[in-house]
Amino acid sequence: LSNMANASVKEFGKAWWSEVYNRIIGAAVFLDDASAECLHWDGGIFNLLNGGAVTVKTLSPFEVRSKVYKKAVFITQTTSTQLRTIHEIIQNSDFTHCILISCVSLDTVYLELNEGKDVSDVIASGRAQSEATKHLEGLLTEWIGKKQSAVEVVHIPIFTISPTSVVFLTPPYQNMYPTYNGKLIPDTSSLDLYTLTNDERSQVRRLASCLNSMLDSMNLKEDIFYMGAYSSLVAGVLENSPVCISRRKTCSNPASLIIVDRTLDLCAVTSHSMESVLDKVMAVLPRFPGHSNEVAVDMSPLCEANVIAHPEDIQLSPGCLFHANDESCMQTYDHMINKSQKEVMFDLYNKVSKIDVQKSPGARALLKVTPQSVEKIITATKGNYETIGRHLGMVQQALGVVQTLKAPRRAQLDLLTSLEAQVVQSLAASRDSTSVLHQISQLIKSRKDRNLPLENLLALIVHVYSLTGTEVSFSKKHEDNLSETLSVAIFEDHKTLFDEDPGRIVTPEACEEVAKGVMSRLKEVAQMRKILQNYQSVLKACEGGAGHEYRGVLQQLAEELVDARRPALPDLRRRHDPVKDLLRTGISMLTSKKPRASKHPLDNATVIIYVVGGITAEECKRLHRSVITSGVDNTVLIGSTRFVTPGEAMRDVLAL
C-alpha cells in the first residue's frame, strides 16, 4: 500500500478505503461530515453495511446511544472538538473495543495536542507519531473504563474524492481559503505560519500532511512550486517538515506539485457564463445536506410522497449526481464536466430511452433534445419502482439536469451572463474612464424589477474587481456611490443574504459597516496579482481582433507549462534553502561548470496542480484540454479544495 507506483488519486482513495473496510466488521461506525462525503464518492453507506458494519451514525454528541453495540469505529479529522464528541459517545455507550481512524497524520495531531509547548525534540527525532498514538490510545482506554478492553489508533488518509480520472477534490478542506488572520493581504511582508490564527495554521499543516500522505502512497518524490503567499506556506511545511523530508528519501517517482492561491484570480469562479453542465447544476440546485460537492435532486416527480421542503423533507431522500458503482453514470458525470450541453442531453436521452414505456423517437430522429423530451420519458415511470430501481443512478442524473435547465434561476443566470459580457467589453473599451461601477449601482437599485438576487450582483462586482486588477482605476465618486447603494441593498435583503438568527436585529448602520468592509475587500482583490510578473493581466484582446476576452491565470499558466518552447515561468516560485544555494554556487564556481538550469515542472512525468480556495468544472475542462491538445506525455492531475459556484466564491472572498 505504501508504494502504489504510477497510481491515480482515485486508486489512492480506493486503496485506503479498503483499509477502513477491513476494520468495521461488527462495529457501529461513526463518521464526521467530511469522511461521509468522501465515502459517498467511494460508493456510499452500503460499502460499510455490506462490509459488516452493524450501524452507521453521524459523529455527533446528539446521536442516539445504544448499549447493544460493543465495538465502535470512529472515522474523523481528530480535532479537539471531535475528541470531546468521541468521549461523550463512549461514555454513553457500552463499548469494549474502539478503533479511532485519524484521516490526518498523527504527527500533525501531536502538534495540535501540544499547541504552545516546545516539542521540537520529539518532532525532529521522528517520535511524534508514536507519542500521539500512545496518548490517544490512553484516552480511549480511560474513556471505556473497563479492565477488558481493546483500542487501536490508526492513520488512514481519507481526504480525497475523484470526480474524474484527472480531477480530485478534498472535502475536509472545503472551507480552507487564502486568508491571514481573516485578511486577504497579510499585515507583514515576512510571512510565516505564525502570521496565521491557530485555526488557519492548523489547516495549513493538516492539508500539507494529507498531501504528503498522498504523495507517499503514490511513491512520488516531488519538486514543489507555488504561486501566491498562502501557497508558499503550504509549500514550506511540505518542504521542511521532517516527515516529508524522510518520505522524499524513500519515494522514487519524480513529480511536480504546483500549489496556487485562488485569490490571484477570482474571475472564473465568480463568472455566470457557464459552459459546463455540472457548473450550471451546482449553481441552480441546492447542496446535498452535509456535502460541499454534491447537489440534492428533488425525486418527488417519481414518487407518491408529498414533499414540502426539499431537500430537508424527511419523507423523501434527495437524489444526487455521482454514482460510484455505476460505470454508465460515471461516464455521464464526466460528460457533464467535459462535453457540451447538447452532447450531455443526447447522452441522457439515449440512456433514458432504454427505460421508455411510451417508445419515444430515438435521439437520431430528433434535431434537438430538450429538457421536456427527457422529462417526459422519466416521469412516465412514476410509481414503477422496479424500473426506477434498475436505473436509479441515471434517473437521478437526468432529473437533476432537467430540473436545472427548467428552473427559473436559469433565466437569472442567462441575464447575468449577458450583463457580464457587456461589462467586459465596456471595461476593455473605456479603461480608466469606465462607468461600470455606476452601471452596477443602477443594476442593484433595479434588481427587484429584473429579478436579480443581490448575492449574484455581489459576485459580479467581485468579478469586475478581479478582472481589472491594477489596470483600471475606478473613480472615488463611483466607489462611494456603490458603497452607499450596497449599504441600502444589504439592509433590504439581509434576511436572504445572511443565514442569521431570526431574533437578531439588523440596523442600517450595521449594514453600512458591512458595505464598507465589502469595498475594502474589493480593493484588496484588485491588488492580488501585483506580485506576479507574467500573469498580471487576465483581460486579453481576442485573436480575431474583435473585442476582449478573459484568459485566466490558471489557463495562462497551463498554456505556458505545456508550450514546447519551454518559456521561463517567473511566477512559479520555489522554496530554496539559502545555505544549500550558497554551497551550490560556491562549488559550481570552484569546478567552473555552468550552473544548472532551473527545474521545469514538466521535467517530471507527473504534475499535480492544486488550487487552494475552490475551482469550477469549466476550469478543470479547459486545463485538461490544454494538456491533451499540447501532446505532452506528462500525467497532469488537477486538484482543489472543492467545486464552487459564483455565490459561494463571493462569500468566501468577502467573508459574508
Language model region names:
Residues 2-656:
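Extended, well-folded catalytic/binding cores that form a central cleft or groove in large enzyme
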